[in-house]
């Protein structure tokens, strides 16, 4: 993985929120997009970097690992940089940009399922604790959903009487010209229905729906992650015939105080005192399912990672279980008392020249510098003769 900083690529700070990250991504993606920079290899490479940066910083778990452990942590979690999506996938991420510039019918719009005044599919949010998401649970869902107004039968018009929209002639779309091109837009008067009410329904105030409520229990699968959605068929809004769409539960998972999640992998930072690093030690560390024994060999490096296979989180769609990764953080005493200082000095003296490794390096460097100066001084003297 190349050594460039994701925040610098998007020209943002490390404290930037998601909205700022998204705006920066759109700006930089448009700037370096291949369609705007044909045959420009540098722009193409920068475009890949922009997407790689956004792929990490827009994902809470990846961003948390990147901020805490750097790219090495991401590599150990299986992230290998730009995912290699083709540019049609990228256009999907940038759809809202093109829609605002060219209108909703440029190929990125979504159609309202059901053809009525409201969408039959509905989305609700559900917050889970870290433990609930990792091990699964059951949750009571309180759902408010739309049903067609009993007075106007879902039309929003008094007595259900609708007239053909005068602005679009019943087509639901109006057309506009930009230069030599013509674009279609949803009719702002009838909102794409092709019909409009001369007088609003007094019961639903023209909305075409009433609100009904229900409660039911949902089984949350083991391993579900933040940002995942659960589809519940037949629990969405109802059309005028009583047929219901689907309910999508958007899952939000709280962060844990000790564990950091990235997909099916889990990270924990293990503080180890410097003397234990020098001597080596064995520790009991907390894991998702109890304790693990961590053997730390002498002279382990700071931020070195120890991987426990099959101790992570179960994949929500398979039997695969991720890794549990323990990362070492070497700690030092903030200050020494007189006795500790004397012991430390005595220990350093006992190592002799080994305790001053810089001397050999510097002496070799000094020798090279002196030789270089002597050589050039001699050449200068020969030149002046």
UniProtKB/Swiss-Prot annotation:
Zn(2+) 1 binds at residues 149, 152, 201, 204. Binds 2 Zn(2+) ions per monomer. Participates actively in the response to hyperosmotic and heat shock by preventing the aggregation of stress-denatured proteins and by disaggregating proteins, also in an autonomous, DnaK-independent fashion. Unfolded proteins bind initially to DnaJ; upon interaction with the DnaJ-bound protein, DnaK hydrolyzes its bound ATP, resulting in the formation of a stable complex. GrpE releases ADP from DnaK; ATP binding to DnaK triggers the release of the substrate protein, thus completing the reaction cycle. A zinc finger (CR-type) spans 136-213. CXXCXGXG motif repeats lie at residues 149-156, 165-172, 187-194, 201-208. It comes from Helicobacter hepaticus (strain ATCC 51449 / 3B1). Zn(2+) 2 binds at residues 165, 168, 187, 190. The J domain is necessary and sufficient to stimulate DnaK ATPase activity. Zinc center 1 plays an important role in the autonomous, DnaK-independent chaperone activity of DnaJ. Zinc center 2 is essential for interaction with DnaK and for DnaJ activity. GO terms for molecular function: ATP binding; heat shock protein binding; unfolded protein binding; zinc ion binding. Keywords: Chaperone, Cytoplasm, DNA replication, Metal-binding, Repeat, Stress response, Zinc, Zinc-finger. The keyword Membrane does not apply. GO terms for cellular component: cytoplasm. Coiled coil: none annotated. CDD domains: DnaJ, DnaJ_C, DnaJ_zf. This is Chaperone protein DnaJ. The keyword Ligase does not apply. Homodimer. One of its GO terms (biological process) is response to heat. InterPro entries: DnaJ, DnaJ_C, DnaJ_domain, DnaJ_domain_CS, HSP40/DnaJ_pept-bd, HSP_DnaJ_Cys-rich_dom, HSP_DnaJ_Cys-rich_dom_sf, J_dom_sf. Its main location: cytoplasm. Belongs to the DnaJ family. Its cofactor is Zn(2+). It is found in: Cytoplasm. Residues 5-70 form the J domain.
